[in-house]
């Protein structure tokens, strides 16, 4: 009888070991190969897609558009008689704000194993792709100013000028791959990008409420 108890104990121990081993290979602990892209939790990061269903690529030109009815594309303008335009605005379906938008390019924070595509919740810099004078050549990268407005004048490499892209669950007729933008400065919590009217202009702005944001889609320029 003692020998039977010992045998039962050994069989039970082996079974528990196999169960524990099997659990280590569930979806809670995905295997990430050296060539895949992952975050700090070792999870594979999906690609961001444009309206044609193609991944966004670093250095390629895109129009960022709010797909909601009455809204429009993001563009650069000079609204303060400054030497360089620095206002990041949003077109609308009213005469004074009609337009096709200003193309942007995405620049990665640093070289990594992410390849040449933009992935969800990875740090990028957003830069308007526009012809500019030598004086304004460094005034095309997005940043957030002290009023929490999105403006240009940022710097690639500045940890406070980082943005990220997150997928939303919004279903908008005729649109696919709907996202939101977040401003993610170093050592601070990310904030959604929303919109506001300031001095008569539709501006992009950071918002504190997690549920308050404007959706965006990306269109190849």
From Swiss-Prot:
One of its GO terms (molecular function) is cysteine-type endopeptidase inhibitor activity. Keywords: Disulfide bond, Protease inhibitor, Signal, Thiol protease inhibitor, Vacuole. It comes from the Eukaryota. It is found in: Vacuole. Inhibitor of cysteine proteases. May protect the plant by inhibiting proteases of invading organisms. It comes from Solanum tuberosum (Potato). CDD domains: beta-trefoil_STI_CPI-like. The keyword ATP-binding does not apply. Belongs to the protease inhibitor I3 (leguminous Kunitz-type inhibitor) family. SUPFAM superfamilies: STI-like. A motif (Vacuolar targeting signal) lies at residues 29-34. This is Cysteine protease inhibitor 8.
């Amino acid at each position: 009888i003692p020998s039977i108890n010992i045998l039962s104990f050994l069989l039970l121990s082996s079974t528990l070991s196999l169960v524990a081993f099997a659990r280590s290979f569930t979806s809670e602990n995905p295997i990430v190969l050296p060539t895949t892209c992952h975050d700090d939790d070792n999870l594979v990061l999906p690609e961001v897609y444009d309206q044609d269903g193609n991944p966004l690529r670093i250095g390629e030109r895109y129009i960022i558009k709010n797909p909601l009815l009455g809204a429009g594309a993001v563009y650069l303008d000079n609204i303060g008689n400054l030497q360089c335009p620095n206002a990041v605005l949003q077109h609308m379906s009213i005469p004074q704000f009609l337009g096709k938008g200003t193309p942007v390019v995405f620049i990665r924070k640093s070289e990594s194993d992410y390849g040449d595509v933009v992935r969800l919740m990875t740090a990028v810099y957003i830069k308007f792709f526009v012809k500019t004078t030598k004086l304004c050549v460094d005034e095309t990268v997005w940043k957030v100013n002290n009023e929490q407005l999105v403006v240009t004048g940022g710097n690639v490499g500045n940890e406070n000028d980082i943005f990220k892209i997150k997928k939303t669950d919004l279903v908008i007729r005729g649109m696919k791959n709907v996202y939101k933008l977040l401003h993610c400065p170093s050592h601070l919590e990310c904030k959604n990008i929303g919109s506001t009217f300031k001095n008569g202009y539709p501006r992009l702005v950071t918002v504190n409420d997690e549920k308050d944001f404007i959706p965006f889609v990306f269109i190849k320029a």
